Design a protein with these regions (language model features):
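Ligand-binding loop in jelly-roll beta-barrel domains
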Residues: 91, 111-138
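Short acidic-glycine-tyrosine-enriched beta hairpin
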Residues: 82, 96-112
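Conserved short histidine dyad/triad with adjacent acidic residue
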Residues: 39-48, 61-77, 111
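Short hydrophobic/aromatic patches on the structural cores and recognition surfaces of FHA
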Residues: 88, 104, 117
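Short, conserved beta-strand element in jelly-roll/cupin
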Residues: 57, 62-67, 75-94, 132
């Protein structure tokens, strides 16, 4: 029988403290303020320890970004990634092309698909992000990419690199935070 996981209450919200099944409301969980990139709820681990210890097979997060805010730096990963727009609108930069997205649009990125999302429209965009972690242990996770189209939206790395510090140098560090009322739609 699979045990129920313990959830630990931190200053920023709930986080898993042991392996097992659990139920956790997104509004009670630990969020991160990502200056110039909106907000993030890493549902399956924020760092390597949490991901490998509690969620070795699947990565999943909720991203909330305002108009003009990228989710991060244009990149590709060795794993499949999938995305669902839960609310609002976004601009997808994929393989150097722009695609407008609206609520309930689903985006599938096979391994090595270069991509980034930018909030658009009149209000916040809520994006569900999911990826496999099956092969990340066998080699590099992926690559940050320099791209003209992504650069127009502050979503490009200055050069192709695997160095997160270099790729994200234009963004202030993320900070853990409690859920802020209004981030998620009712």
């Amino acid at each position: 029988m699979v045990p129920e996981a313990e959830l630990e209450q931190t200053e920023a919200g709930l986080v898993p403290a042991s392996s097992g099944w659990f139920v956790m409301n997104a509004r009670d969980a630990r969020w991160f303020d990502k200056p110039k990139q909106g907000h993030s709820l890493p549902l399956t681990g924020y760092d390597e320890y949490e991901a490998e210890t509690f969620f070795p097979m699947l990565g999943m997060s909720i991203r909330v970004m305002g108009p003009g805010e990228p989710t991060g730096t244009y990149h590709w990963e060795t794993e499949q990634e999938d995305f669902l727009v839960l609310a609002g609108e976004a601009l997808l930069i994929v393989e150097g092309h722009e695609r407008r997205l609206k609520q309930w649009d689903f985006v599938h990125c096979p391994p090595e698909t270069r991509h980034a999302f930018i909030g658009s429209g009149d209000g916040p965009c809520v994006l569900l992000c999911a990826s496999s972690r099956q092969f990340q242990k066998d080699g590099p996770w992926g690559f940050y990419c320099a791209d003209e189209t992504a650069a127009r939206y502050n979503a490009s790395s200055p050069e192709d690199t695997q160095d997160t510090d270099l790729a994200d140098a234009r963004f202030p560090p993320s900070r853990p935070m409690r859920y802020r009322e209004g981030l998620l739609p009712d």
